[in-house]
Amino acid sequence: MRHTLPHAPQFYVTAPQPCPYLHGRAERKLFTALAGDSANELNNALSRQGFRRSQNVLYRPSCESCVACMSARIRVSEFEPSRTQRRIARRNAHLRRLATSAWATEEQYELFRAYLDERHADGGMADMDIFEFAAMIEETPVRTRVIEYRAHQGDSSEIPPPPDSDQLVAVCLTDVLDDGLSLVYSFYDPALEGFSLGTHIILDHIDLARSAGLPFVYLGYWVPGSRKMDYKAKFSALEIYKGGVWQPIGDPAQHTSDIHPLSIDPIVEQVARINLPSNRR
């Protein structure tokens, strides 16, 4: 009788590229494929260790001379909205949330293009066509939802929906983990910047996680010194994954992107410390 043993994930490293967050620095990522029956379990385990999902790949920054990127998550039970965040929630309370399967639509792509053209015209995703967008949404081997936010005609709101229809104003691609919700990618109507829809998406996911009994909302990476990431530090009960452990962020100003050369471990040691699901060892 022949038995097939489970294969442990293989980890690889990308070639250095210009960092999108800190000028003059190089970015390098440690990554592994995400596939098969154990994909959800692997996604759960590695998300707790600072990894993020992009389609069928899990990755974590592993730069040669920088450890500035730190995974961030909100402790749902301890979160208290600020006065500004409460005002944002009230202003967007009329929006209808719709959770759908991971299926891309032309309407979503049009909103995505408007968002990129206005907010990230020089970014790495700026040239994505509709087929690449569909791959970003649909190529997922794990439990994923597309969360849409819509304003309806007749709503008592300042967001005017188009005649005879409702208006798609924001979208979030969300993974459902065993301990929380992970915001993979979100975008919104750039013409409605005054409504702080990015913040509203996070606040709504905190409510979603609380109602589902999930303890965390994963926000991706926080980078001290990066203005693009400043908004994440404005949420209370925020934890960062630093030095191999989750810890309260404390005063964001105390964190720096400057490091000692000996504080970065070789790739082999980093991989050896990754805790894999028990059936994948």
Curated annotation (Swiss-Prot):
Species name: Paracoccus denitrificans (strain Pd 1222)
One term of GO molecular function: arginyl-tRNA--protein transferase activity
NCBIfam families: PRK01305.1-3 (NF002342), PRK01305.1-4 (NF002343), PRK01305.2-3 (NF002346)
PANTHER family membership: ARGININE-TRNA-PROTEIN TRANSFERASE 1, ARGINYL-TRNA--PROTEIN TRANSFERASE 1
Protein name (record): Aspartate/glutamate leucyltransferase
Subcellular compartments: Cytoplasm
Catalytic activities: N-terminal L-glutamyl-[protein] + L-leucyl-tRNA(Leu) = N-terminal L-leucyl-L-glutamyl-[protein] + tRNA(Leu) + H(+); N-terminal L-aspartyl-[protein] + L-leucyl-tRNA(Leu) = N-terminal L-leucyl-L-aspartyl-[protein] + tRNA(Leu) + H(+)
Keyword hit for Coiled coil: no
